[in-house]
């Protein structure tokens, strides 16, 4: 990565995080699950999920492998349908995409430039001739404006995930669904991406739903942590810690302990 680009990214993520109350959301609803069940054949993956999320909230969903976390996210993103129960979404806002999904793998098109990959996120939105400029603007927000016309193959893993994040955000989604998007990154890159994600969330005020196995990541980023066990919500915990948050603080460690006790107790 060129030195200038690396410097710009690091200066961006290192800037102070804006102060925000621990829980600060608008009165609008982002979505609500009511009695949602999802079966695959005879297997019950989600069993009576009730979850009401206000617009603008950052929710982390955590649990052991196979507990139903990713299935919940797929239902929210419209990639699957519940077997029973209801999922209600808030009113769609003009000029905003409804929900965008970010996966653990960047899933970039190797034959398209970085900026063209980002423009794909405008599919279904009337961007017209502004598409390239909108893509360039969001690439600037993730620190990759100078890589816009390069091929994905020359980017590092962390840079590819920044492109994937830009693609998800270019349409100004109301809800961003994140399925362990940082799981494959090294520790330092992961922290930088966490800071970047938090900064953009604070600026754009979308609703974020992050599926993760990392309890520390959950309490660092989220307003609220939902623990799923055997397809049911075992814990729904607010994170009453004002931002900016100090990693490793006693407050966050205590919350981590509560979550781990529920996961393994």
UniProtKB/Swiss-Prot annotation:
Gene Ontology CC: plasma membrane
Any GO MF annotation of the entry: ATP binding
Enzyme class: translocase
Statement: the UniProt record of this protein carries the keyword Phosphoprotein: no
Keyword terms: ATP-binding, Cell inner membrane, Cell membrane, Membrane, Nucleotide-binding, Translocase, Transport
Residues noted as binding ATP in the record, renumbered to the chain: 63-70
Membrane topology: Peripheral membrane protein
Catalytic activity: ATP + H2O + aliphatic sulfonate-[sulfonate-binding protein]Side 1 = ADP + phosphate + aliphatic sulfonateSide 2 + [sulfonate-binding protein]Side 1
InterPro entries (alphabetical): AAA+_ATPase (IPR003593), ABC_transporter-like_ATP-bd (IPR003439), ABC_transporter-like_CS (IPR017871), ABC_transporter_ATP-bind (IPR050166), P-loop_NTPase (IPR027417)
Compartment list: Cell inner membrane
One Pfam family per UniProt: ABC_tran
This enzyme's EC code(s): 7.6.2.14
Family membership noted in the UniProt record: Belongs to the ABC transporter superfamily. Aliphatic sulfonates importer (TC 3.A.1.17.2) family.
Subunit details: The complex is composed of two ATP-binding proteins (SsuB), two transmembrane proteins (SsuC) and a solute-binding protein (SsuA).
Known function: Part of the ABC transporter complex SsuABC involved in aliphatic sulfonates import. Responsible for energy coupling to the transport system.
Official protein name in the record: Aliphatic sulfonates import ATP-binding protein SsuB 1
Gene encoding the protein: ssuB1
């Amino acid at each position: 990565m060129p030195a200038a680009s690396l410097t710009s990214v690091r200066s961006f993520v290192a800037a102070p995080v804006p102060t925000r109350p621990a829980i600060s959301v608008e009165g609008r609803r982002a979505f609500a699950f009511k009695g949602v069940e999802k079966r695959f054949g005879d297997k019950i993956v989600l069993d009576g999920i009730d979850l009401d999320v206000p617009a603008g909230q950052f929710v982390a969903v955590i649990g052991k492998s196979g507990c139903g976390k990713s299935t919940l996210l797929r239902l929210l993103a419209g990639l699957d349908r519940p077997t029973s129960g209801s999922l209600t979404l808030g009113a769609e806002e003009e000029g905003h995409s409804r929900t965008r999904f970010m996966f653990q793998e960047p899933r970039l098109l190797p034959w398209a430039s970085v900026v063209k990959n980002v423009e794909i996120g405008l599919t279904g939105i009337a961007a017209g001739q502004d598409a390239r400029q909108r893509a360039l603007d969001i690439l600037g927000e993730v620190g990759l404006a100078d890589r816009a016309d390069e091929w994905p193959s020359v980017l590092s893993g962390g840079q590819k995930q920044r492109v994937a994040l830009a693609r998800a955000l270019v349409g100004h989604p109301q809800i961003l669904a994140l399925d362990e998007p940082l799981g494959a990154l090294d520790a330092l890159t992961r922290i930088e991406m966490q800071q970047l994600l938090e900064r953009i969330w604070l600026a754009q005020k979308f609703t974020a739903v992050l599926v993760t196995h990392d309890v520390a990541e959950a309490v660092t980023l989220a307003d609220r942590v939902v623990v799923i066990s055997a397809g049911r919500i075992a814990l729904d915990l607010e994170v009453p810690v004002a931002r900016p948050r100090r990693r490793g603080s006693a407050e966050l460690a205590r919350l981590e302990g509560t979550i781990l006790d529920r996961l393994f107790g």
